[in-house]
From Swiss-Prot:
This is Large ribosomal subunit protein uL3. GO terms for cellular component: cytosolic large ribosomal subunit. The keyword rRNA-binding applies. It comes from Phytoplasma australiense. InterPro entries: Ribosomal_uL3 (IPR000597), Ribosomal_uL3_bac/org-type (IPR019927), Ribosomal_uL3_CS (IPR019926), Transl_B-barrel_sf (IPR009000). It holds the Pfam family Ribosomal_L3.
Length: 221
């Protein structure tokens, strides 16, 4: 069953499992998820549930979006995403009415999830840092220390050529992370491993797409 919820990365810590092993944990706040719109094949061409997360002020919200939030009888939201699901993968989100709160009970401890976020921006970086290329000679008259090397033919550009440029600040998805614990009172997810993006960054948590074998799943847990 396809499930999804929005959250904000709080930070990382570590916990002990039942075997006494130290497990790296990412804490994600999933409180105040509100259903803004339900989409279906007949009207929109696909099935999806639009969710809003994290309040923002009215004065920094456009008038069309203010009307959209007013229909859902909720305050303006900073982070809006659609949880798309196929007809055969019916989600319990589709049963919620517009304006309803999305509970963290959608997921259970031990579930495998895919977490999508925006990676940390590193700014302009060279090929050694950005693409892990080897550096050139440092002595004996060489001037090719950290240069990218040949650009290819004079005419035209080669698609996919590894060159210096913006590093990071891209949409990244980490698959098959284990939901280590769920705090229903504080609406917190404790996810085993790292999650893309900085602290206070928004993330989308969905049910894992790729199925693992029993051996792989046990190794994850």
């Amino acid at each position: 069953m396809a499930q999804g919820i929005l959250g904000k990365k709080i930070g990382m810590t570590q916990m002990f499992n039942e075997q006494g092993e130290i497990i790296p944990i990412t804490i994600v706040d999933v409180s105040a998820n509100v259903v803004l719109q339900q989409k279906n094949v007949a009207i929109d061409g696909y099935n999806a549930t639009q969710i809003g997360f994290d309040d923002k002020k009215d004065k920094i919200t456009t008038k069309p979006m203010l009307g959209h939030f007013k229909k859902a009888k909720t305050t303006p939201k900073r982070f809006i995403k659609e949880i798309i699901f196929k007809k055969e993968n019916i989600s319990s989100l589709s049963a919620l009415a517009v304006g309803d709160q999305v509970s963290c009970d959608l997921f259970q401890v031990g579930d495998l999830v895919d977490v999508t976020g925006t990676s940390k921006g590193k700014g302009f970086a060279g090929v050694i840092k950005r693409h892990n290329q080897s550096r050139g000679p440092e002595t004996h008259g060489s001037r090719h220390h950290r240069r990218p090397g040949s650009m290819g033919p004079i005419k035209g550009k080669i698609k996919g050529k590894k060159l210096p440029g913006q590093m990071g600040h891209q949409t990244v998805t980490i698959q098959n992370l284990v939901l280590f614990s769920v705090d229903n009172q504080k609406n917190l997810f404790l996810i085993k491993g790292s999650v893309p993006g900085p602290n206070k960054g928004f993330v989308v948590i969905k049910s894992a797409v790729k199925k693992l074998s029993k051996e792989q799943a046990n190794a994850k847990i």
